[in-house]
Amino acid sequence: MNIILNILNQFLKKGRSIVILKKIVRRFSKNNFDKNQYKNWLDSNKSSLDKFLKKINHRLFIETKKESLKINDYANNRLKNIKVKLGGGANDMLLYFFVRYFKPKVVLETGVAAGFSSLSILKALKKNKYGKLYSSDFPYFRIKNPENYIGILVDKKKFPNWELKIEGDEVNIPKLISNINHIDIFHYDSDKTYKGKINVYNLIKKKISNKSILIFDDVQDDKFFYEICQSSNLQYKIFKFKSKYIGVLGKIKSNEI
């Protein structure tokens, strides 16, 4: 009953009903592909993230490991008394390392939840003393007052270089990128459906180039990542993270990705 009331409350807020309906329709849309065959492709192309990062820059890898421990200890302590589920954290090591290594001017991410990915990116940007993070999210409409939990791990006073919008990707992204010339690093971790990923990719593709690094979480859910790999000239890398897979598109060094 509480879930229904929470959904209704969010549904009645301006602009939220259309986003919620689209999410529900996409969630129940059929996703026709051979999951076993696709998993075999992922497994045959996956790499060890630790080995990959060490090969690029061993000293930075050590720094990243230390920061990852700090981030996860802080997050676990911050979230242990919260009684709602806010979704799993992203691969903070990959995000922190890439931001430190590339020193991007612009990072765009979709999917914030508690803010694991946001905090990792922002800490790396702060270490770089350069760059801004633009984040897109939509409240978990099944819980009460979901806006209060978005980015709860991030102390906004410490990170003035963070711009967050919470009206859904289709509304947020055009606003976020309107004054951006180029997206240096893009991290996708929002709508898990094929249609949702295609929509976001179409929104950002004019702002990316072969110099951009694109990171997609949960690529095992559909063939979106595979199709992008096949249709673009970008090199790719796949990493297993817990029970899921992360896909990376872009060029780091010719012999490393």
Please tell me what each predicted stretch does.
Residues 81-86, 92-257:
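S-adenosylmethionine/decaboxylated-SAM
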Residues 1-59:
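Membrane-proximal basic amphipathic "stem/tether" segments
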Residues 37-50, 65-75, 111, 148-155, ...:
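Short charge-dense sequence patches
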Residues 46-91, 97-102:
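Class I SAM-dependent transferase core
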Residues 13-14, 54-59, 66-71, 156, ...:
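Polar helix-capping/helix-linker motif
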Residues 12-19, 30, 57, 77, ...:
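Short, flexible coil/linker elements and helix-boundary hinge sites characteristic
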Residues 21-22, 60-79, 173, 177, ...:
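Generic hydrophobic, helix-prone segments enriched in Leu/Val/Ile
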